[in-house]
Amino acid sequence: IAFGKWLNVGQTCVAPDYLLVDARVHDELLGLIKEEVRRMFGEHPLDNEDYGHIVNAKHFARVRGLIDPDKVVLGGAAREASLKIEPTILDGVTPEDAVMQEEIFGPILPVLTFESLDEAEAFITDRPTPLALYIFSQDRSVQQRFVRYVPFGGGCVNDTIMHLATSHMGFGGMGASGMGQYHGRESFDTFSHKKSIVNKATWLDVPFRYAPYASWKRKFVRMFVH
């Protein structure tokens, strides 16, 4: 999860935009993610040369404006001079919060909880169809439920990002997140134009398709239409 969220400082179109976590494992999971962030970027990520920059000042200001200080449980600091924002986790987020109203495209991970799988499924399906969905569960029935019945472009089970790293599978969105796929064979099909052609024989021409449309022609056509 930490890899997928903070790869390129969250500036990928398939970075997790929010984390929907079972309330029973919420505290444990957040603790593990915090540990991993510190392991990857250190205690002072703004000083880490391997930790990236936000692409420009306008984007920096937009992303920083999504941080609610009252909900920060990790990170939250920013340095405008270098266009860096710490890996940030917001906990106790609600669907009405500003950070849930748009694609983040930055190093902020909002965390929400659910009590049942029905609640989790409804939360996802009530929102615009995502480009990617990542399911973390060892239960095959849970995996299949979300893969089969929740609309999304593509994704992973127990991983993030890696579904677009292979040319053997198509990559693309669905509905609000786009239509069509590319990568591998899908690229060839998507960017090729298939021409539909009727090649009519010259030795026969069916006259009833031409005007005037006498009653016998209408009856003849109805035989095939109905």
Each PLM stretch: what is its role?
Residues 1-95, 117, 157, 219, ...:
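ALDH superfamily catalytic-core signature
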Residues 84-226:
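Conserved C-terminal structural/oligomerization subdomain of aldehyde/semialdehyde dehydrogenase
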